Regions:
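C-terminal accessory regions
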Residues: 47-151
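Conserved helicase/translocase motor-coupling segment
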Residues: 1-81, 110
Length: 151
């Protein structure tokens, strides 16, 4: 990013299993500081320490966004599947209304960047039943298949 171009990390408010990547959506981010803070303000998006969810970024744009994916919205067997993390495991979302809500959350996140974005899909961890590689690999492969470049 150049000059005054703003960048930051955005995630689904349901992305509970990004904590091993130091992303905890349960920590409340102040959108005023995140969007308006200067480059020397540790609360600003520039520091890439605090993330914003679809609630904090709706209606606002960044020049550059890093969208960090989680296992709540997965591409598998040629369709998008929706999950909610409850207790110690992912559970299938059954209600159509909640499925649509999650899909729209990711739509908001994917439309926040004016100039460009990076989509981060974690590798997963075979030793963590909540972050198995298969929760992420098919989404990652789908993005590559539709032409999103790997960097």
């Amino acid at each position: 990013a150049r000059g005054t171009e703003r960048y930051g990390i955005v995630v689904s408010s349901q992305a509970y299993r990004l904590k091993p990547m130091a992303i905890d959506v349960r920590v409340e981010t102040d959108p005023v500081h995140w969007f308006l803070g200067e480059k020397n303000d540790v609360r600003s998006s520039y520091y890439l320490e605090d993330v914003a969810t679809e609630f904090q970024v709706q209606g606002l744009e960044l020049d550059w966004a890093c969208v960090t994916w989680d296992g709540d919205f997965r591409y598998s067997n040629d369709e998008w599947k929706t999950y909610s993390f409850v207790g110690n495991k992912w559970q299938n979302i059954k209600k159509e209304e909640r499925k649509l809500y999650l899909k729209n959350a990711y739509r908001v996140l994917l439309t926040r960047a004016r100039q460009g974005m990076v989509i981060v899909v974690p590798e997963g961890n075979v030793e963590d039943h909540t972050r198995q590689p298969e929760f992420y690999n098919s989404t990652y492969e789908y993005f590559k298949r539709i032409g999103i470049k790997e960097i």
